[in-house]
Amino acid sequence: VARQLLGNLDDLNEARVAFLLPAGFDYVAVQWGIWRAGGIAVPLCDKHPLPSIRYVLDDTNAAILVYSGTFDALLAPLADRDGLRLIRLEEMTVTQQTGALPQVDARRRAMILYTSGTTGRPKGVVTTHANLSAQVLSLVEAWKWVPGDYIVNVLPLHHVHGIVNVLCCALWSGACCEFLPKFDADEVFDRFGRGNITLFMAVPTIYHKLIARWNELDEAGKSALTHALSGLRLMVSGSAALPVRVLEEWQTVSGHTLLERYGMTEIGMAISNPYDGERRPGCIGQPLPSVQVRLAGENSEPVHGDSPGEIQVKGPTVFLEYWGNPAATSEAFTEDGWFRTGDLAVVENGSYRILGRNSVDIIKSGGYKLSALEIEEVLRTHPAVRDCAVVGIPDDTWGERVVAGLVVGGPVETDELSRWLRGQLPDYKTPRHYLFLDELPRNEMGKVTKKELKKMFTDQKPSEQ
């Protein structure tokens, strides 16, 4: 793969190489081939519509796009795109070329993953090879990965959770990683029943769905599954807060106390409950190896004792920069080099507990961190929408459910609006409820008061999708 990407070049020299491939061996071969050729890997989500894909290609100025023929129809409009070399996976050939591949310094940029922020549009998070190595080594040590481990992956591979926590840790350790093409509770239970799985990692939404399916089984089925789950050594939850009820119900299903951890695209994993030791409900544990964590006040002054503060992180796991956005990069760090996560926490009996998010414009739904501002920006392009505001409201399954308050200029069918939105945004960013209003709630400065909008959703019955 590396030689095919290089062509006549000696080194890709951090050229951005996007790839759109189903989870499996080909995904791994292309990702690592990009790195071996000296390129920057830009994984795309196989469930995103073309506008989302085009945005990433534009923002990174990608030189190459490697894709599976499965996506021929989706990517057809890119065929004549200037400056983009399209490589169809099925047309790649095994090369007989020999010779040295480039030496890639650990300080080079390795990957760009996209994450939503309060500026609205997704930002490209750049990690170096050294960053990725530090992230993986920290987890391998803390969670005691060994060559005999076997993990089944149900997580998306355009996200740090699936790429680093599962795939890279497994490869680094010499363990086995099996991919499921999509999440299906019965398929997951079938893999558990085979008896070779040692680890499993998922978002709270997946555990919620597994619990719901387990409750539908007869007593013999429940007993067999619980016995199979007892053979796993570790089960991890992350990417969103783990509801205590889900943790307790999963204990009943599996006999396991889920290990909850805390991380972000920008920092990898930073805090984790212990592999050995007490895992307290509602808490995320202690800093991982090589990670420095502090709580800080509004002016980034350290706070102590049981006072709440913003989680700030420093260390080799922390990303290099936001791609092409030096202003956002500068704003993300304190003057003394700590990354501002925007999450508030307290330390209780030596363990961190998350209190919430500094910004109401960040929604955590189903393991994704979504920007309300990005969704609003797209909604406002619909001809019938005069104004809008998007918020997240608590939901047992998703953590937070995306909802929208709308001011419209005439009759609007919510089904039609949702269909239109799904052509512009990934499905998981599409609001599940709409509230039609004469005007949005605002303060005296004219700013939308999103806390009041959230309350309106609890007081009224909105239209549901």
Named regions from a protein language model:
Residues Q286-S290, N299-A332, S351, L370:
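Conserved ATP/PPi-binding loop(s) of AMP-dependent carboxylate-activating enzymes
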Residues A110-L137:
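Conserved AMP-binding A3 loop
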Residues R3, G315, L320-E321, L344-K429, ...:
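AMP-binding/adenylate-forming catalytic core of the ANL superfamily
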Residues A2-H48:
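Conserved AMP-binding/adenylate-forming
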Residues W143, I197-A202, A212-R280, Q292, ...:
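Gly/Ser/Thr-rich phosphate-binding loop
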Residues Q96-Y114, G120-R121, K144-Y150:
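Conserved pre-ATP/AMP-binding loop-to-beta segment of ANL
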Residues Q4, H48-P77, T95-Q96, Q135-V152, ...:
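Conserved ATP-dependent adenylate/AMP-binding module captured primarily in the ANL superfamily
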Residues S133-Y150, V160-L199, K209, R213-L217, ...:
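Conserved AMP-binding/adenylation subdomain of ANL enzymes
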